Structures are given as structure tokens and as C-alpha cells.
Design a protein with these regions (language model features):
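Short, solvent-exposed loop/turn segments at secondary-structure junctions
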Residues: 26-27, 91-93, 108, 126-128, ...
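Non-heme Fe(II)/2-oxoglutarate
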Residues: 189-287
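Active-site region of the double-stranded beta-helix
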Residues: 81, 105-112, 121-132, 138-140, ...
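Histidine-centered catalytic micro-motifs
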Residues: 100-108, 187-193, 207
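Short, surface-exposed loop/helix-turn segments at secondary-structure junctions
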Residues: 104, 159-169, 199-201, 220-226
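Non-heme Fe(II)-dependent double-stranded beta-helix
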Residues: 1-112, 148, 228
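Short, conserved beta-strand element in jelly-roll/cupin
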Residues: 111-128, 176-177, 184, 207-211
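Double-stranded beta-helix
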Residues: 11, 128-194
Length: 287
């Protein structure tokens, strides 16, 4: 039997590619993480960009977040008890009606198979007026559509990508969340988010979860084991951070992000280094 999700919700995820909203942590616990984030932003005003990719490697409190029982129980209901967290990303929007994310499929750039479940954890209200994530039900079972990159926009997306093809946008469903709730969605689903016209920042962390049997052919990437055991060894294991923004933590983070970016930014028209705050060496190949 599922731990958190009902059998109907598990079936809905398979059919529609998402399930939401699910209560994962209390509002008080979410505010704890929000305060940690805001303290980080105050201490490191020029380094928030580092939270856009594999943030669990540089902040102990994010490593704590990805291990929340409510998050992992819901994830286990979808991909089983042996779970790796492959990536963590901050997606925050000011309440200024500007920042958005165009329609896209993460499988346009991510190459991990057979499935990546993205857990969107809300640390503030993420309702329709706040620019919540939106998705096209069932589109994860369809083809990968062609994407283009945009420039000089207010897109949240690292490559400012958008789908350059026709599809039924009228079928979109809002993944509206209250503070402490999660949406779980297949990374192949067509999804986007509008600008935030609410009264508060929209703060979401995206936690990219994969079963331990997941794989990527080349290059070999890293992930962190958050539940169960890893009998496959398809990923190197990320070290858990002991100190926020510590020297060892930043060095490990940079190595891991350079490898991941060599895939995610393959063929990109801007270097991944500039987008993710890396500091030295050459830009990842193809980026």
C-alpha cells in the first residue's frame, strides 16, 4: 500500500504525469526553511545563483530538506523505496508580475532514464496568482517537442527555453500549492508558470528524484542517496555538506555542476559557468 498517496493518486500520476497538492511538511517547517534561505541570501547576496543547481551540496539545511519524511514517502509511492536526489534548484519569483517560465519539457536537455520525478516544495504560497507551476495532463506520454532558446527575457529557466510547436495550452492545469505542500510531476510533462501577481514572493525548491536503477550513459553524473540502498552504482554519490558554502563543499559542488552542465547545457548559446556562478577553469564542453 502507498505511504502517502492513495492508489487513485498513483494511477493519476501515471496517467496525467503529476499529482498535487500533497501536504509534505507543516507550514511552520516550511517557514524554517524559508528563514534559512533568507539568511543565506543576506550572507551571500552575490551567490544565490549557486542555489539553481545541486544546491543540496553547499547548504546543510537543503540536504535536510531533501530528506524530509513527507517528501520521501510521497516520492517512494511513485518510484519505490530506493531513492537518489539528482538535483535541487531554487525557483523564486518576486511579486512584481515579471518573471515567468515558458512552456517546456525538462527531457529536452536532461538525459537520465527511465524517469525523473520532480518534487516542487512550496516555502511560500504558490497559487494561481503567485505564478504556480502549470502542466498539460498526459503530455509526458507524448513526444518530445522542439525547443528554442530566448534571450533578454524574464524567464526563470537557465536556457530561457520554450516549446516551438503547437499544442493545446487550453488543457493546462494549475499545480496550486499552499506553504509546505508539494506537487510531484514527471519531468517529461509540458509545464510552465506565469508571473507572480500576488502579495508575497513565490518560493519553490525543485527536488529531482530518481530510482536507484536510473542511469545516464555519458558522462557519469552524481546524486545523493536519500532513502534505501543503492545496489546499482550508476551515479557517484554526492558528499553531504557539513558547512554552508565551505571550501570543500564549494569544490565538490563545482565539480558536480560542471559535469551535469555538460549535459544540460549541451549546445547552449551561453556558457553554463556564467549561469550558475562557477568560478574557474573552462566552461563545460558544449556549453
Amino acid at each position: 500500500m502507498p505511504k502517502v498517496l492513495s492508489p487513485a493518486q498513483v494511477d493519476a500520476f501515471k496517467r496525467d504525469g503529476f499529482v498535487a497538492p500533497i501536504r509534505a511538511i507543516s507550514e511552520q517547517r516550511a517557514l524554517y526553511y524559508r528563514h534559512k534561505l533568507e539568511a543565506f541570501e543576506s550572507r551571500y547576496p552575490n551567490d544565490r545563483i549557486k542555489l539553481d543547481q545541486k544546491a543540496h551540496m553547499i547548504c546543510p539545511w537543503i540536504d535536510e530538506m531533501i530528506r524530509e519524511p513527507g517528501v520521501l514517502d510521497a516520492t517512494e509511492d511513485l518510484i519505490g523505496p530506493d531513492i537518489l536526489c539528482w538535483g535541487t534548484s531554487l525557483r523564486a519569483k518576486q511579486a512584481d508580475g515579471k518573471t515567468f517560465a515558458g512552456w517546456h519539457q525538462d527531457t529536452a536537455y536532461a538525459e537520465v532514464k527511465p524517469i525523473v520525478v520532480i518534487v516542487a516544495l512550496a516555502l511560500s504560497p504558490a497559487r494561481t496568482e503567485n505564478g504556480c507551476i502549470r502542466g498539460i495532463p498526459g503530455s509526458h506520454r507524448g513526444p518530445l517537442l522542439p525547443h528554442k532558446e530566448a534571450f533578454a527575457t524574464n524567464s526563470l529557466l537557465s536556457r530561457e527555453q520554450f516549446i516551438d510547436a503547437d499544442f493545446d495550452q487550453g488543457a493546462a492545469v494549475d499545480f496550486a500549492l499552499d506553504t509546505g505542500e508539494i506537487a510531484l510531476f514527471n519531468n517529461a510533462i509540458i509545464h510552465s508558470s506565469n508571473a507572480n501577481f500576488g502579495n508575497d514572493r513565490r518560493i519553490i525548491f525543485l527536488l529531482e528524484m530518481v530510482p536507484t536503477h536510473a542511469y545516464q550513459h555519458e558522462p557519469r553524473e552524481s546524486a545523493v542517496l536519500v532513502r534505501g540502498t543503492d545496489a546499482y552504482g550508476n551515479f557517484d554519490l554526492d558528499p553531504q555538506p557539513k558547512t554552508e558554502m565551505g571550501t570543500a563543499e564549494l569544490a565538490a559542488w563545482q565539480r558536480a555542476v560542471e559535469i551535469q552542465s555538460s549535459v544540460l547545457f549541451r549546445g547552449a548559446q551561453r556558457p553554463a559557468r556564467a549561469l550558475h556562478g562557477m568560478t574557474s577553469g573552462q566552461a563545460p564542453s558544449g556549453a
